[in-house]
Amino acid sequence: MRATAQRLEFIQDYLTSLFGSELHVKRVCSLSLAVLGVMTSASLAVAVIGQALAQARGKAAKHAIKQVDRLLSNQGIDVWDLFPLWIQEAIGASRDLVVAMDWTEFDADDQSTLALNLVTKHGRAQPLLWFSVFKAELAGKRNDIEDMCLSRLKEALPKEAKVTILADRGFGDVKLFGFLGELDFGYVIRFRGDIFVTAADGETRRAEDWVGAGGRARKLAGAEISKEKQKVGAVVCVHAKGMKDAWHLAASDGEATTRAIINLYSRRWSIEPEFRDTKDLRFGMGLSAVRVGDPYRRDRLLLLSAIAVMLLTLLGGAGEALGMDRLLKSNTVKRRVHSLFCQGCLYYDAIPNMPEPTLLALMERFRALIMENSVTAAVLTVG
């Protein structure tokens, strides 16, 4: 119980420093309890979160489940209004940002969620901003929703931040290229092979016909895309060995090398493991198996997930930095076997029975990682 109280106190202090200027103290408390439940259960099912919270605090499950359920319906917690504070926390001191953008589907509830995630070094893209809608609302409005979310991201970022958007061919719209230019965002976006591309010398071919012999990459600096002649920094067309389909990439930076553009786009994939961590019932938190009738409830649930995942990932990073990951794997390979998120879950569960010297070292490293973000420094330097 003492360990649970300490965890809850830490989470509440952390969220107070993060959202205290926007949320009432009681709402911060409710949010903290729900995050504790998510971290303890590693699930996004409301009943499971409530049961884990009740077990951790020695309370009745019925009341804890109702508390979590009421939180998800609390209109006083407007995720859209919290994004500027959350984004500042998620990016920390970083100012050169690579952001992956993609839609993910929740077919059982007939809903879709647009996600803008920060590409990180550890293989999982960190959620920055998301927006859920009923699929029926997407007809004729999808581009408007994407523009709205990109504009919100721009508003929330420091003026000196440099952003590069990565997106797959579902976003290969020349109007989006122009809009990103208006926002002063860079981009590397894949587009379909049947779209016409005009080289700087005026020659026009379908994108698929610009791929070099044997699938080798070809870069067209200062190219124009589609019949609208949308100017981009460069187009790269490649069908390298091992690729299922050719990549036709529009890039804003015409000075970037062919390899740099290809490597940058390949990092877009890191949003997929994050979707799996959130949605998959076996390998993640199981959101795809949870019925959520209201998109606003889903967005609040995703906020709980984002906070819990970030804290658990930092905890996993702290343990790995101390070499604790060697005790999690049964082999002797040097590479990472468990993701930082998975490691964090394992360390979190082990805390109650962890030897005190190990626990102190882990917490010291964990605090050092969190203090890299100035937003939370005030909490952790008190006392």
Task: Give the positions of each predicted feature.
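Short, charged amphipathic recognition helices of the HTH superfamily
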Residues: S41-Q51
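Active-site- or DNA-interface-adjacent structural scaffold in DNA-acting proteins
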Residues: M39, L53-A108, A167-D168, G181
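Short glycine-rich loop/turn motifs
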Residues: Q111-L116
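Single, function-defining residue in the core of a domain
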Residues: M1-S43, F83-P84, S94-L97, A108, ...
